[in-house]
């Protein structure tokens, strides 16, 4: 089973970016990628971007609630950190509570405006050492 990388917005009021803007920004970031649009009854995502569709593909997905973006496929932690920094750049609002984590929720990085891929990696917090449910109770009720 592969581990997906997640970029959730954790507050009750914020959003990352709408699907149309995500599609536009993705096409700028990854020219030549393949875009898939989905209807509400088909999937939880409304836009999937397939990077390197003819090779080791990576899918970056936008969820229709505008509060989650995920990345899955043939990518390592460093590539996921690059995507995380890009996702944060989509919405520079300093009040946006955006994290980078995995589908197994074994750690996280708080994505602050202007964060670099190197900082995403360096600021990773291991959940075996820091319990997010205790340290961030406002996001987990």
Describe each region flagged by the PLM:
Residues 1-32, 36, 138-141:
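Short, extreme N-terminal segment that most often corresponds to the first beta-strand
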Residues 36-57:
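Amphipathic, interaction-prone secondary-structure segments
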Residues 34-42, 98-104:
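A generic structural motif
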Residues 29, 37-39, 43, 64, ...:
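Arginine residue identity/basic-tract feature
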Residues 50-141:
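Charged interaction segments
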């Amino acid at each position: 089973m592969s581990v997906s990388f997640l970029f959730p917005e954790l507050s009750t009021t914020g959003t990352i970016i709408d699907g149309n803007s995500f599609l536009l920004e993705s096409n700028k970031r990854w020219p030549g990628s393949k875009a898939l649009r989905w209807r509400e009854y088909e999937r939880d995502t409304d836009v999937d971007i397939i990077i390197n569709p003819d090779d080791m593909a990576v899918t970056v997905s936008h969820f229709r609630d505008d509060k989650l973006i995920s990345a899955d496929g043939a990518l390592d932690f460093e590539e996921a950190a690059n995507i995380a920094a890009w996702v944060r750049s989509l919405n520079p609002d300093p009040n946006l509570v955006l994290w980078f984590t995995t589908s197994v929720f074994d750690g996280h990085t708080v994505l602050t405006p202007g964060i670099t891929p190197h900082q995403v990696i360096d600021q990773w917090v291991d959940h075996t050492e820091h319990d997010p449910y205790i340290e961030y109770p406002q996001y987990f009720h």
